[in-house]
Regions:
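Conserved ABC ATPase "signature" region
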Residues: 17, 67-85
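Conserved signature/switch motifs of ABC ATPase nucleotide-binding domains
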Residues: 31, 92, 110, 134, ...
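A short, proline-enriched helix->beta-strand linker immediately N-terminal to the Walker B motif
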Residues: 109-113, 129
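Conserved ABC transporter NBD signature motif
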Residues: 9-17, 29
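Hydrophobic anchor residue at the start of the ABC signature
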Residues: 104, 132
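A short, surface-exposed alpha-helical micro-motif characterized by mixed small hydrophobic
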Residues: 157-159
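Conserved ABC ATPase signature
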Residues: 90-94, 98
Length: 174
């Protein structure tokens, strides 16, 4: 995603080295890959309404405008199990699980090929964790998504993953 530049090693996507990609080329690549952050409390801009947060990617990537954005945001909210009438609310008005659903909707908005799910349930109550994991699984089946799941919780990995790589000190060891 190039949120930070790599300090060592190389990252490739579809045979293209990501280091050095800039401008429109980087924006085009980012449409294909999205992220769901670990902490739903700090990953949503507190000054933006939910509808704006989710619709922002649609506008940045010229995928929709005006009423089209509103319709797509409503569709995405429903897709992740939230009512479309929450679009005008702010992130602080939601629980952690609801915020993570908003983050998932935001990631889905641009129809990515894959989503990096960085510890997507570690900051949530145990009672909510399985709901979010099951939502991610349902979305994977419905849209043919690929997830790169980052997790220290082996139960989460077992529930979600079809292939696993174990890393230690920045290297795949298993």
């Amino acid at each position: 995603l190039r949120l930070l530049d790599a300090t060592s090693g190389e990252v490739y996507f579809r045979g293209q080295r990501l280091h050095g990609v800039e401008g429109k080329a980087l924006r085009s690549l980012r449409q294909k890959m999205q992220i769901v952050f670990q902490d739903p409390y700090s990953s949503l801009n507190p000054r933006m309404r939910v509808g704006t947060l989710i619709g922002e990617g649609l506008k940045i990537h010229d995928l929709a405008e005006g009423a089209q954005v509103d319709r797509r945001v409503d569709e995405l909210l429903e897709m992740v199990g939230l009512s479309s009438n929450v679009r005008s609310r702010y992130p602080h008005e939601f629980s952690g699980g609801q915020r993570q659903r908003i983050g998932i909707a935001r990631a889905l908005a641009v129809n990515p090929e894959f989503i990096v799910a960085d510890e997507p349930v570690s900051a949530l109550d145990v009672s909510v964790q399985s709901q979010i994991l099951n939502l991610l699984i349902d979305l994977r089946k419905e849209f043919g998504l690929t997830y790169i799941l980052i997790s220290h919780n082996l139960a989460v990995v077992e529930h979600m993953a079809s292939r696993v790589a174990v890393m230690y000190l920045g290297r795949i060891v298993e």
